[in-house]
Design a protein with these regions (language model features):
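A structural motif corresponding to the C-terminal lobe/cap of the Radical SAM core domain
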Residues: 1-160
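Membrane-proximal basic amphipathic "stem/tether" segments
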Residues: 144-182
Length: 182
């Protein structure tokens, strides 16, 4: 990561997807959770802005697995290992192994592709749609914690940083509304 920084990179995105090794194995991620967390730490230490993505709504994940993923997302943000995070619901896109598995197991709630926009669960899960949406929202709410806000303020180095934080705050509010339970 130091070489990336030296070469002019400023940003790196890690698709963590889940904090559960079984899920990572089932979706053929090819990584261990510990390795991904360590990568976030090393990239941040090298001076790169780390963005992390996580997803909720895998058909085999229950409450424990959801809590693990929420906790990991919040921890990465609170400790500053990730500067930003995106949490969404998992979408089984046609043609993927996950989509095929959904068809084989009758896990799809809809085949209306206009609804495959990551704003609502598409797959049946053990915990229900409302709980998944609550999990997505709970990760975004860490942006309102005193530690996270203080770290962002201390990290301001330029007017560009101020504008970025303003845009990011707007997006957080937007995502909270996107995933608000009806």
């Amino acid at each position: 990561y130091k070489l990336m920084k030296k070469a002019g990179f400023r940003f790196v995105l890690f698709g963590l997807e889940s904090a559960n090794q079984e899920t990572l194995d089932r979706i053929n991620k090819g990584e261990k959770i510990e390795t991904m967390i360590e990568s976030c730490k090393m990239a941040q230490k090298a001076g790169l802005s780390v963005h992390v993505t996580i997803m909720f709504g895998y058909p085999w994940e229950g409450e424990k697995e959801i809590e693990n993923t929420v906790a990991l997302g919040r921890e990465l943000l609170k400790k500053g290992y990730a500067k930003t995070l995106q949490a969404t619901v998992c979408i089984p896109y046609p043609g993927t192994p996950l989509y095929k598995e959904c068809l084989e197991n009758c896990w799809l709630q809809t085949e209306d592709y206009s609804e495959y926009d990551m704003r609502r669960p598409i797959m049946k899960t053990p915990v229900g749609d409302d709980r998944l949406m609550e999990a997505v929202q709970s990760v975004y709410k860490v942006a309102f914690s005193p530690e996270f806000i203080a770290r962002r303020i201390v990290g301001i180095r330029s007017w560009e940083d101020v504008k970025f934080i303003g845009r990011a705050a707007g997006k957080v509010f937007g995502h909270l509304l996107d995933f608000k339970n009806s």
